[in-house]
Amino acid sequence: MAPISAASDGAPYADALRREIMRSEQQRMRAVAIILVFLLLVTVAATGLLPELSERLMDGGVPMWMPVSTMGPFIVYEIVALLVLRWRMAHDRDFPMIGRFVNALVETSLPGAIVYVMGSRMAAHVALGGWPPLLFFIFILLSTLRLDFWLSVWTGIVAAVELLLLANWLLPLSWDGPVNETFHYHSSRSLILLLGGVVAGLVAVSLRRQFENSVATAAARDRVTNLFGQHVSPAVVDRLLETSA
């Protein structure tokens, strides 16, 4: 018997894989939107409920408009991007690769925007050493759901470059100043972000292979059913697939 594979199904296999990738991208965007809304709510609540801490961080306290004006546009962008993705999925249209790279650039710039706004109103080392730079790792982690090695690496590159440029802009950096204001200190932090992007890319490749195997198995099963009729029992289909493997 000739091997039964998804390759003989051609376009249906490619379409099924594309739809799985789009669904994974949709899950990632939904997670990003939820995280951003949660961060905004927590930040606004902390600003109002912890006035003493707010005043210690910034002269006059952290104004309520700051987190809203910083994170609000990114939340709106993410919701719009998610709606666009859903529309394209409903019309069986792919998400252009250039659009995915641009989307990764915009999303990963949120932590940088927060650091920039905070650093312009408080001590730079506080903004750079606080929680906002850690958000880069969340975006790098979620990039695995893009199922593309280079998109994860791109996310790591954007995070690494933005953090290093912000440190140089806010401090600026030197070679022989205080340790936390030196170029090699902050470049090492950026290097970790870049390596995180590479590791996330390897995980994304592994996840994509699992998706490909699942889609290939489903396509082969459908082909067996089409060849021998709808009344073939699942046990017979499994035996045929095992024989052709």
Regions found by a protein language model. Give the residues of each.
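Short, Lys/Arg-rich, polar N-terminal cytosolic tail immediately upstream
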Residues: 1-24
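N-terminal membrane topogenic signal
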Residues: 21-37
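Hydrophobic transmembrane alpha-helices and their membrane-interface boundaries in multi-pass
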Residues: 35-140, 159-161
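Hydrophobic membrane-targeting alpha-helices
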Residues: 45-49, 117, 165, 169, ...
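Hydrophobic transmembrane alpha-helices
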Residues: 103-125, 143, 149-185
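Alpha-helical transmembrane segments of multi-pass membrane proteins
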Residues: 108, 134-141, 190-197, 201
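Alpha-helical transmembrane segments and their immediate juxtamembrane flanks
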Residues: 171-214
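Regulatory cytosolic signal-relay segments
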Residues: 197-245
